[in-house]
Amino acid sequence: MFKDITLGQYYQTDSLLHRLDPRVKIVGTLVYIISLFVVDTFAGYFVCLLFLAAMICLSNVPVGYIVRGMRAILILLLITMSFNLFLTPGEVLVRIGFLKITREGLIFSLKMAIRLSLLVIGSSLMTLTTTPNQLTDAIESLLNPLKRFRVPVHEIAMMMSIALRFIPILMEETDKIMKAQIARGADFESKNLIKKMKSLVPLLVPLFISAFRRANDLAMAMEARCYRGGVGRTKMKPLIYEGRDQAAYMLLVAYFAICVLLRFLRLPFLI
């Protein structure tokens, strides 16, 4: 399950989305996430889905590779849907004992599931098409105005980039530890939820030790290369906006405008 997480991984290939300025991709991801909370109808989510599908086509990343990240949040998705399905008041459609499924709960749970799925896939697409160095430079460039207030922009950008890239590494490490403990007789497949949670507790100690060891190795490697923060550092590949980046910004503005219109344009056939 852990190896299915695509957030934080980079998929190397040549595509239009890979060649875009990383600042455009970060801003685009933020705009896309905001748009998911702006729209509140199935028509709006369909527009978000079309936009995401177009970006996936432009990325040349296999759809199966992107969608497999959904397996990791399947339990969270089911829990979210269940809470909204049974706890939302409204017109009762089905009653099962003390539980009741309402029309409003059914619609709201479907919307939440769609929103969460699109959010995870959209966020993963940014890291799949952006290298760690590009991500760090882009975050630093976007936060650059904060330097006037003595905010350590470079260090913040570096920490965010490292944290994001450590997600798949830690998930892979967790998978290895689980396999090692299964070989020693540990049971992670129990259907009893309490037993399953207890079996995950022994994972924490080796996982924390591994995380600290990797962090120490990274710190030593950075010191060996004389890393002293962002003071006096120059860029080997400075970020420069090109024509395609400006066109991408215009596309983002048009997309967000459509989402806002769908939110405030109350048509009777939009649910």
Question: Predicted regions: what is each one?
Answer:
Residues 73-186:
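Juxtamembrane/interface alpha-helical elements of multi-pass membrane proteins
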Residues 51-61, 76-79:
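Alpha-helical transmembrane segments and their membrane-interface exit regions
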Residues 69-73, 77, 113, 117, ...:
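Loop-to-transmembrane-helix entry motif
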Residues 41, 45, 60-64, 88-96, ...:
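Transmembrane helix-loop junctions in multipass membrane proteins, especially transporters and channels
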Residues 1-42, 48-57, 144, 148-151, ...:
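Transmembrane alpha-helix interface motif
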Residues 25, 64-74, 248:
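Alpha-helical transmembrane segments and their helix-start/interface "positive-inside/aromatic belt" motifs
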Residues 14, 37, 60-65, 96, ...:
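Membrane-helix interfacial "entry" motifs
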